[in-house]
Amino acid sequence: FENRSKAYSKYFDKETGFEVSDMGNIYHAVLENFAGKLAESNLTWWNFSEDFALKTVKESVEAYAATYGETVLYSSARNEYAITRMSRILTRTVLTLQQHLKQGSFQPDDYELSFRFAEELDSIHVDLSEEEKMHLQGRIDRIDVSEDAEHVYVKVIDYKSGNKKFDLAALYYGLQLQLVVYMNAAMELESRKHPDKEIVPAALLYYHIDDPTIETPVELTDEQINEQILAKLRMNGVVNSDPEVVERLDHYLQDKSAVIPVEKKKDGSFSARSGILSREEMQLVSAYVDAKIRDIGREILDGKIAANPYEKGNEEACTYCAYKKVCGFDGSIPGYEKRQLEDLDKQTLMQRMQETMEA
């Protein structure tokens, strides 16, 4: 759906093969395997040691790489180094994710949840007409929950090998729907597990899988270095602005959280740099994404495949598109034009979503 919102022809064409530069599959597989190894070792995300992380990640990366035999991953010294680098990055990742969990009261509830194993969920079956139904495909990297006597708070995390940023305007235009779709499915799943409790969306977050370097003109202690690395690996996304939810996500938040995209001003209110939405705004965004997916699905079935990719400021769908020859778009030919997308602020976006839902 996001590809179709960028340029219609991108929906129909898929690339095959494995690129060394695209390590996403390995990252996801190793992180899923790590969670399984914790359970096998009677450990949790809170109490595993750094030595356990180093050993488990290294073995998992090497085992996964071995499944490719003497193909791409071992085809050169450079690619062999990539395996070592992945081990380092993923060790940093599991240690950082451990620290994130220790900051709050959430615990992982599901990993790599494929929609194929959630066939009963209404949120992944979209009625386009009385005769036509669309089935969504996807995989939720991680669902975390925090519970009390009456509520289940839900956090959805999507692992990214690139530095993905949550963009409400991109969501509005149909370019960034995935994370909300995952939250809708996770909310429904938790409601079936806990029919006697209220299910509350807590956070929709991207985690950048990376091992950042710290450049400083002065010598730092190991603790200071780790603090700066943790700050660079703070999750990006949107958080429920309810103080109870924020406190469950980060018990130690004072002025700027090290784990979620939330900052506070001196008076205790959230700063404009915070990625927050109210409970009502989250519900609106959820409903809007459902409607947007239904509209896009209807257009795909109706055969609307005009070559009119989007353009928003300096960003455009064609910049890194591998399907230009398939698309045939040529701006120099009369009749070809790109969709110009406005750069809108949060208040305007929420108002337009509300108007769309009321129409």
Question: For each of these PLM feature ranges, what is it?
Answer:
Residues 1-359:
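Structural signature of nuclease core domains in nucleic-acid processing machines
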